Amino acid sequence: MRISLFSGRGTELVLGLTSAIHKQPISAPVRCTFAGLEGDEQCDLRHHGGPDRALHYYPADHYLWWQTWQTALGLPAPRTPWQPAAFGENLSGIGLTEAQACIGDVYRLGEALIQISQPRSPCFKLNQRFGYGQLSQVMQLSGRCGWLLRVLEEGRVAP
């Protein structure tokens, strides 16, 4: 399975609210440390980052579902397109969703060894990013949240 890598720096999401949710594709090899991908930032360290939340994986498979959801409800286009990295993930791929992944599963990512540590608990920043007031709750109810990972062995990873 091919995994895409993303990283971001803190920027203003809305007036007075800084977030590193705006991730960009990584096109060259990067080091994966116990704190996450080198060059990636977390702004709210109370809720993001740390050894058990070093990386965030979101299944690319889900983006079509979100587009269908938006269309079915007749909602206007979101502020951010439904595409990988839109939910602030560091890792995304096709073929691995919540239906196959379990807490404790271990994966080799390049030279790094990573482990699923917990489900992602989406927050209000998604509502701001997409312009839909209840998006984080819809995400939780749909079960399409992705998950967080810890890094067991540091190493170089490449897109």
Report the location of each language-model feature.
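Electropositive, beta-rich accessory/interaction domains or terminal extensions
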Residues: 1-128, 134-135
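A mid-sequence, solvent-exposed acidic-amphipathic segment
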Residues: 133-150
